[in-house]
């Protein structure tokens, strides 16, 4: 299951909820008629419960959504804090040189000298660009996920090649 975001609060009295997205193109989720919800982002696939999308739109600087069968504020409050996910095959295909963060987690990171720098543990968004959090034992590197540093992403080989020195 790919985690897409989290329900952060109820919105209004008709069952709508505020959504905090974890990616940069959450409006594409509207193409999926069904979402999945779970209490834990790391929950096994069997713990994710499907919900049918009744509405989804931008609201101010955020997003709001409504689900079939969740028609009042009490129902929306019951969803607060739950994670939103979807199976990989339900997601829109990313464009060339675009990746779902979940596909990058666990990839090995090597530099141009073929030195192993570690494994992608997480990603974070800084506003300016995304950053790879690369773990190598007790060491952590933060590598900007931009073309100047990320030279190649090979999902099949499970590697990311970067222009980054081992001692940085």
Swiss-Prot record:
Cytoplasm: is it a keyword of this entry? yes
| Entry GO terms, CC | cytoplasm; ribosome
GO biological processes:
ribosomal small subunit biogenesis; rRNA processing
Superkingdom classification of source = Bacteria
What are the PRC barrel domain coordinates in residue numbering? 96-168
Single GO term (MF): ribosome binding
Family named by the database record:
Belongs to the RimM family.
Q: What is known of its domains?
A: The PRC barrel domain binds ribosomal protein uS19.
Assembly and oligomerization? Binds ribosomal protein uS19.
- Extract the NCBIfam families matched here: 16S_RimM
What is the protein's name according to its record?
Ribosome maturation factor RimM
Q: Which organism is it from?
A: Aromatoleum aromaticum (strain DSM 19018 / LMG 30748 / EbN1)
**Gene designation:** rimM
């Amino acid at each position: 299951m790919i985690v897409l975001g989290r329900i952060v609060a109820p919105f209004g009295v008709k069952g709508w909820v505020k959504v905090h997205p974890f990616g940069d193109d959450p409006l594409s989720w509207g193409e999926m008629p069904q979402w999945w919800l779970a209490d834990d982002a790391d929950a096994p696939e069997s713990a994710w419960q499907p919900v049918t999308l009744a509405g989804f739109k931008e609201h101010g600087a955020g997003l709001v959504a409504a689900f079939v069968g969740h028609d009042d504020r009490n129902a929306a409050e019951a969803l607060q804090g739950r994670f939103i996910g979807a199976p990989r095959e339900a997601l829109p295909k990313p464009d060339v040189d675009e990746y779902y963060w979940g596909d990058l987690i666990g990839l090995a990171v090597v530099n141009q000298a073929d030195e192993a720098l570690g494994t992608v543990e997480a990603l974070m968004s800084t506003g300016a660009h995304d950053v790879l959090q690369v773990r190598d034992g007790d060491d952590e590197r933060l590598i900007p996920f931009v073309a100047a540093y990320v030279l190649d992403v090979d999902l099949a080989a499970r590697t990311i090649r970067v222009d980054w020195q081992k001692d940085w």
